[in-house]
């Protein structure tokens, strides 16, 4: 993670309002100094590559804007959205950018430099766990070393494909990224590897292959979604919608009968709840299709 250029060094703030299906990002431009004085800043949609669609700026202001955007390109918020479109980036770095930048994009963080410290502390905690090496399951999907990280990034990709579509285009981008990054944290330290005998269909010989099982002493005390929400809320200040999305991301697959009403109410009230459910299922479906080929 690069050294943070603090917001008080910017004349203009860049607030993403659309990922545009991962092709480019549309930003809302805010005059940072005016905003800090409590007034309404100037607003414009800009294309990050050209900045040509910004209206109402003179040549001096346009030069200042370009300088600010170049500085902004080292900020976690920018790196998070760029990482979504980078398929060849190191997956651990990609996840770090998306988690940290995603949290800094949330309304409760409000581009606060304090939010950067909070997110970095969460990363430091993750580094003490097996998150980056754990499987996503024992058999159903991504049941291999690093599978949990791979699945999480796939969910982020699916979410980015959906978020600009109705009815999800009102969802806060930061909340969406944080919920995707944290939705399966309950699986941290859940599995252990062992060697399993498997018959090679080509040679007919039995071979030992690495497999995973749930640790005997490990159980999810609060349930799948609630456990992930609990861990995420220990690290971040979550909005109710973000917390609900993590809590209910399994949809009807992990809900008691007497909880169905609460699930349906959250689906109706919070678009992010359904968005994360769809992204999670789409990721698993894509995995299954790829395995069949």
State each model region's role.
Residues 1, 46-69:
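Ampiphathic alpha-helical segments that act as solvent-exposed interaction surfaces
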Residues 1-3, 7, 293:
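Short intrinsically disordered terminal tails
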Residues 2, 12-14:
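Short, acidic/polar N-cap/turn motifs at the starts of alpha helices
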Residues 6, 15, 25-29, 34-37, ...:
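Short linear proline/tyrosine/threonine-rich motifs used for host-factor recruitment
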Residues 27-54:
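Acidic, low-complexity, intrinsically disordered interaction modules
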Residues 57, 136-144, 150, 162-292:
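Divalent metal-dependent catalytic cores for phosphoryl transfer on phosphate-bearing substrates
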Residues 58-59, 63-208:
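Acidic/His-rich, divalent-metal-binding segments that scaffold phosphate/diphosphate chemistry
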């Amino acid at each position: 993670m690069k050294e943070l250029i603090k917001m008080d060094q910017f004349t203009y703030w860049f607030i993403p309002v659309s990922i545009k299906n991962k092709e480019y990002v549309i930003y809302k431009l805010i005059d940072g100094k005016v905003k800090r004085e409590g007034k309404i800043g100037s607003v414009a949609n800009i294309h990050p590559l050209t900045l040509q669609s910004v209206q109402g700026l003179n040549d001096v202001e346009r030069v200042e804007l370009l300088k600010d955007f170049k500085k902004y390109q080292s900020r976690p918020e920018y790196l998070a959205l760029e990482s979504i479109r980078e398929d060849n980036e190191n997956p651990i770095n990609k996840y770090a950018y998306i988690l940290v930048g995603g949290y800094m994009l949330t309304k409760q963080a409000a581009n606060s430099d304090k939010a950067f410290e909070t997110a970095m502390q969460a990363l430091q905690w993750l580094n003490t766990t097996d998150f980056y090496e754990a499987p996503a399951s024992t058999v159903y999907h991504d049941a291999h070393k690093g599978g949990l990280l791979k699945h999480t990034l796939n969910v982020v990709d699916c979410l980015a494909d959906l978020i600009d579509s109705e009815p999800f285009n009102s969802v806060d981008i930061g909340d969406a990224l944080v919920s995707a990054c944290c939705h399966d944290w309950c699986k941290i330290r859940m599995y252990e590897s062992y060697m399993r005998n498997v018959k090679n269909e080509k040679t007919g010989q039995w071979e030992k292959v690495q497999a995973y099982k749930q640790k005997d002493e490990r159980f999810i005390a609060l349930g799948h979604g609630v456990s992930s929400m609990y861990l995420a809320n220990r690290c971040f200040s979550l909005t109710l919608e973000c917390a609900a999305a993590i809590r209910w991301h399994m949809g009807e697959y992990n809900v008691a009968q007497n909880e169905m009403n609460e699930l349906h109410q959250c689906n109706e009230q919070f678009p992010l709840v359904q968005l994360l459910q769809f992204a999670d299922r789409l990721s698993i479906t894509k995995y299954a299709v790829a395995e069949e080929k």
